[in-house]
Curated annotation (Swiss-Prot):
Its main location: cytoplasm. Residues 77-102 are annotated as: SUMO interaction domain (SIM). Residues 497-507 have a biased composition (Low complexity). Isoform USP25a is found in most adult and fetal tissues; expression is moderately high in testis, pancreas, kidney, skeletal muscle, liver, lung, placenta, heart, but very low in peripheral blood, colon, small intestine, ovary, prostate, thymus and spleen. Expressed in the brain, with high levels in the cerebral cortex. Isoform USP25b is found in all tissues except heart and skeletal muscle. Isoform USP25m is heart and skeletal muscle specific. It catalyses: Thiol-dependent hydrolysis of ester, thioester, amide, peptide and isopeptide bonds formed by the C-terminal Gly of ubiquitin (a 76-residue protein attached to proteins as an intracellular targeting signal). Residues 541-578, 684-717 form a coiled coil. The lineage of its organism: Eukaryota, Metazoa, Chordata, Craniata, Vertebrata. One of its GO terms (molecular function) is deubiquitinase activity. The gene is USP25. A motif (Required for SUMO paralog-specific binding) lies at residues 89-95. This is Ubiquitin carboxyl-terminal hydrolase 25.
Length: 1055
């Protein structure tokens, strides 16, 4: 200690009180210190009561506030502007001529900004803001309660919930609990923390503990956390249900008015509970005066506060857990840390003490697990609600903390002074460079090099005529322009205008007349072709031009050299600053990024997930509730740095890179092999997990039995239908009906195809003297194949697709095997419908005989069937697309969406096999996206109406048609338009959070938003594909041509 103990106590008390006052000032917007101190005194230091007291007091005078607002908004009302509660004391005249008032206003503004900037790294502030936010939500949603099934419904098929091999296990969202999943998964993947929890044993005297210990629910929570961790280790399920642990947390987190706390406070509370639970165990197992607590050893460190308070020096050692950092105003993590470690002047509550105050923080002991809270929320006093800060903040995978250690403080101070000196010099250089890059004295400025170049170009230009104005006047009016004598005079124009307009004031008539005579040269005439495009000097001698060019060239070269030198100097300084801490002595304390907790949304609502580094596989994993997927550093950066969309990191968890015990696996003492899965569990948890796995195995067996029984029933039903269909087909053929529906038919032998086949056979028989059926068949097949090849190679407009006309065209374009095409053509000429034509009967018999002679080894029947199945799917996809686009044009967006979704999915599957297997993917994607946007707009308008029936209809549209299909747009990250469309839809609904609405509407919105913001890529089950009507090839081609023609007539911005 460098001062007496009472000075330190006074410092701590004043700092604590000042912190509370700063929090109240920011939350409530009240700047009067006396009012704030009185509120804090009346509430006995309770921040929540103080906020409630102040907000209730302000709420009593809404009319006065409204009046004040309009007085400041209307320029003609008053010359004075009232600012918060200082309207009577700090009135500044900004409309008069007194420059002192203006300077005073600027000074006050800067002082307020600097004060807010200095108040960084205060966890209580975060919590207070969160409480105000939650109070607002609680008032609107009226203590909303939700059942787990409203958020997520388990698939009836247990195989959808089965864990794949040793894949990481997810956590089920049981009602806005994505925050729980993100935090717990981050801690679970710290192997040392996992071991501590799994091997925890409650104190033997747990029943004898004081009643308040049980009220805290530490031991029940530890029991449920052990069970949860055990399931995460050894379950056979894809995800597990954390409901029991969550319920204990929710009960403990509810205050008297049922407000639920924020995620940061949840993490604090979680570690506090764990610390208490392990403290009880530690005290039982040791007789030491201060037993070691493994939670404290793992997550808590110490720093030394060194500073000056009212002119007196002090040093004080403090313990810290999660380290809070402000984001606003900083570009990377080191800048945040620098600002948090160096505090500026501390405001004194006693005005008579004028000594300067300030302090530095130096880490003396860092925890193995170092967690940074990134404060991305601030209270907007103008709007009266918290707002999220979306600014970009970069952070490294390896963070070196040597510069913040107490043992390095002398060298760090030297380096900080050097960096400050370099930054000051950098500012001077940048200002010099700016003078070169933005040259001029007017509002428009240009690079000086360009100015000199333009001057050189002007001087070198050659004049064509003496006066461009005279030249234009002298030239005759070009074709299409109006001769001057035909234009009405100014008086005539004014008279015409006056006669057409209603009676107006003289000033408005004068304004109209002044505007009516404005000459518009670029719309009233065209420039003669011989007029020079650039101006040029009228008179300049060769000597003058030579001197001027020489000077301009020389000056331009000088400026280019100066600019280059400045840019190189600036780059060198930047590089020097970046490498300031890169020497070996300052990279001895490496911390590696272990987990990043991400929040997407606004201050009032959003979704949480986590990126966690898999140290065994050396890759990043994304934990998003039940979905656990492989990820990458690039994806993490895109979602976590901020500045893009609404997602950004709110918590960073670093681990000591030299503390390998944190991530080291356990090994079998006998075999030396690493223990995996259920082997790592204590006996009691092993029995618990095995019992749960047996229940799940039984569920799988019951499902298999149900499927087997269902398959048997379907098989019996199918055989019965087959017998009935064979009877009906025989009856239809006997009736001589040549045209039938082609959906189930592989040969697609419709009326128009039958006529084309007959024409080909007739043509082939006329070309050969040998009229034998086999000769005619061979000739006909050659002619038909040549015709189809020509169609396949023809360049057609979008409305004509010959693949729809004939299956062989589809095969040719997709390079099907020759044997597949030959057999398909034989089936065309061997179709039984040709038996009704005397000219083709014998040809059909020969074709059928050839088909029967084809051996299985000559044509792969499975491949043959697969090609025809793909063609059937192509026709179905076409029909889905046609109906979807027709409904879209009729503005029947729900029906359109269902068909377009099926079209897109089928088409994507086809295109994966070949470029010409399906339709234009971008076209289908565009209308699918537009359909979702239109439906979202309709639903939002229904919600805005406020009518219960309309609101419910709007939410039904969102829940039934928008939310289930959003993952389809997010699957392909390369489709930027789809991702932006999803962001637009989400932002539309998030924008309602800042609006006043009825409590029941706020409740519905709060219930619905987590589903909309769920970032899970897992595609949940949705509506069955709509049934297609029966259609002929002719109808299919005709409707396709009609809809594509209508699209081609749609303007580009409408497609």
């Amino acid at each position: 200690m460098t001062v007496e103990q009472n000075v330190l106590q006074q410092s701590a008390a004043q700092k604590h009180q000042q912190t509370f006052l700063n929090q109240l000032r920011e939350i409530t917007g009240i700047n009067d210190t006396q009012i704030l101190q009185q509120a804090l005194k009346d509430s006995n230091g309770n921040l929540e009561l103080a906020v409630a007291f102040l907000t209730a007091k302000n709420a009593k005078t809404p009319q006065q506030e409204e009046t004040t607002y309009y007085q400041t908004a209307l320029p003609g009302n008053d010359r004075y502007i009232s600012v918060g509660s200082q309207a009577d004391t700090n009135v500044i005249d900004l409309t008069g001529d007194d420059k002192d008032d203006l300077q005073r206003a600027i000074a006050l503004s800067l002082a307020e900004s600097n004060r807010a900037f200095r108040e960084t790294g205060i966890t209580d502030e975060e919590q207070a803001i969160s409480r105000v936010l939650e109070a607002s939500i609680a008032e609107n949603k009226a203590c909303l309660k939700r059942t787990p099934t409203e958020v997520w419904r388990d698939s009836r098929n247990p195989y959808d919930r089965k864990r794949q091999d040793k894949a990481p296990v997810g956590l089920k969202n049981v009602g806005n609990t994505c925050w729980f999943s993100a935090v717990i998964q981050s801690l679970f993947n710290l192997l040392e923390f996992r071991r501590l929890v799994l091997n925890y044993k409650p104190p033997s005297n747990a029943q004898d503990l004081p009643r308040n210990q049980k009220e805290h629910r530490n031991l029940p929570f530890m029991r449920e956390l052990r069970y949860l961790f055990a399931l995460l280790v050894g379950t056979k399920r894809k995800y597990v249900d954390p409901s029991r642990a969550v319920e204990i947390l929710k009960d403990a987190f509810k205050s008297n008015d049922s407000q639920q706390q924020d995620v940061s406070e949840f993490t604090h509370k979680l570690l506090d509970w764990l610390e208490d639970a392990f403290q009880m165990k530690a005290e039982e197992e040791t007789d030491e005066e201060k037993p070691k607590n493994p939670m404290v050893e793992l997550f808590y460190g110490r720093f030394l506060a060194v500073g000056v308070l009212e002119g007196k020096k002090f040093e004080n050692t403090e313990m810290f857990g999660q380290y809070p950092l402000q984001v606003n105003g900083f570009k990377d993590l080191h800048e945040c840390l620098e600002a948090a470690m160096i505090e500026g002047e501390i405001e004194s509550l006693h005005s008579e003490n004028s000594g300067k105050s300030g302090q530095e923080h130096w880490f003396t002991e860092l925890p193995p697990v170092l967690t940074f809270e990134l404060s991305r929320f601030e209270f907007n006093q103008a709007l009266g609600r918290p707002e999220k800060i979306h600014n970009k903040l970069e952070f490294p995978q390896v963070l070196y903390l040597d510069r913040y250690m107490h043992r390095n403080r002398e060298i760090t101070r030297i380096k900080r002074e050097e960096i400050k000196r370099l930054k000051d010099y950098l500012t001077v250089l940048q200002q010099r460079l700016e003078r070169y890059l933005s040259y001029g004295s007017g509002p428009k400025r240009f690079p000086l090099v360009d100015v000199l170049q333009y001057a050189l170009e002007f001087a070198s230009s050659k004049p064509v005529c003496t006066s461009p104005v005279d030249d234009i006047d002298a030239s005759s009016p070009p074709s299409g322009s109006i001769p001057s004598q035909t234009l009405p005079s100014t008086t005539e124009q004014q008279g015409a205008l006056s006669s057409e307009l209603p009676s107006t004031s003289p000033s408005s008539v004068a304004a109209i007349s002044s505007r009516s005579v404005i000459h518009k040269p670029f719309t009233q005439s065209r420039i003669p072709p011989d007029l020079p495009m650039h101006p040029a000097p009228r008179h300049i001698t060769e000597e003058e031009l030579s001197v001027l060019e020489s000077c301009l060239h020389r000056w331009r070269t000088e400026i280019e050299n100066d600019t280059r030198d400045l840019q190189e100097s600036i780059s060198r300084i930047h590089r020097t600053i970046e490498l300031m801490y890169s020497d070996k002595s300052m990279i001895q304390v490496p911390y590696r990024l272990h987990a990043v907790l991400v929040h997407e949304g606004q201050a009032n609502a959003g979704h949480y997930w986590a990126y966690i580094f898999d140290h065994r596989e050396s890759r990043w994993m994304k934990y998003n509730d039940i979905a656990v997927t492989k990820s990458s550093w690039e994806e993490l950066v895109r979602d976590s740095f901020g500045g893009y969309r609404n997602a950004s990191a709110y918590c960073l968890m670093y681990i000591n890179d030299k503390a390998q015990f944190l991530i080291q696996e356990e090994f079998n003492k006998e075999t030396g092999q690493p223990l995996v899965g259920i082997e790592t569990l204590p006996p009691d948890l092993r029995d618990f997990v095995e019992e749960d796995n047996q229940r799940f195995e039984k569920e799988l067996e019951e499902w298999d039995a149900q499927l087997a029984q269902k398959a048997l029933q379907e098989k019996l039903l199918a055989s019965q239908k087959l017998r009935e269909s064979e009877t009906s087909v025989t009856t239809a053929q006997a009736a001589g009906d040549p045209e039938y529906l082609e959906q189930p038919s592989r040969s697609d032998f419709s009326k128009h195809l039958k006529e084309e086949t007959i024409q080909i056979i007739t043509k082939a028989s006329h070309e050969h003297e040998d009229k034998s059926p086999e000769t005619v068949l061979q000739s006909a097949i050659k002619l038909e194949y040549a015709r189809l090849v020509k169609l396949a190679q023809e360049d057609t407009p979008p409305e004509t697709d010959y693949r729809l006309h004939h299956v062989v065209v589809y095969f040719i374009q997709n390079q099907a095997p020759k044997k597949i095409i030959e057999k398909t053509l034989l089936e065309q000429f061997g179709d039984r419908n040709l038996s009704f034509d005397e000219r083709c009967h014998n040809i059909m018999k020969v074709a059928q005989a050839k088909l029967e002679m084809i051996k299985p080894e000559e044509v792969n029947l499975e491949e043959y069937e697969e090609w025809h199945q793909d063609y059937r799917k192509f026709r179905e996809t076409t029909m889905y697309l046609i109906i979807g686009l027709e409904n879209f044009q009729r503005e029947s967006y729900i029906d359109s969406l269902l068909f377009l979704i099926c079209a897109y999915q089928n088409n994507k599957e086809l295109l994966s096999k070949g470029l010409y297997r399906g339709h234009d993917e971008e076209l289908i994607s565009h209308y699918r996206r537009e359909c979702l946007l239109k439906l979202n707009e309709q639903a939002a308008e229904l919600f805005e109406s406020g009518e219960d029936r309309e609101v419910n209809n709007g939410l039904i549209i969102m829940n039934e048609f928008i939310v289930p299909f959003l993952p389809l747009l997010l699957v392909d990250e390369m489709e930027e338009k789809d991702i932006l469309a999803v962001e637009d839809m989400r932002n539309r609904w998030c924008s309602y959070l800042g609006q006043e609405m009825e409590p029941h509407l706020q409740e519905k919105l709060t219930d619905f938003l987590p589903k909309l913001l769920d970032c899970s890529m897992e595609i949940k089950s949705f509506h069955e594909p709509p049934k297609l009507p029966s259609y002929s090839t002719h109808e299919l081609c005709e409707r396709f041509a009609r809809i594509m023609l209508s699209l081609s007539r749609t303007p580009a911005d409408g497609r």
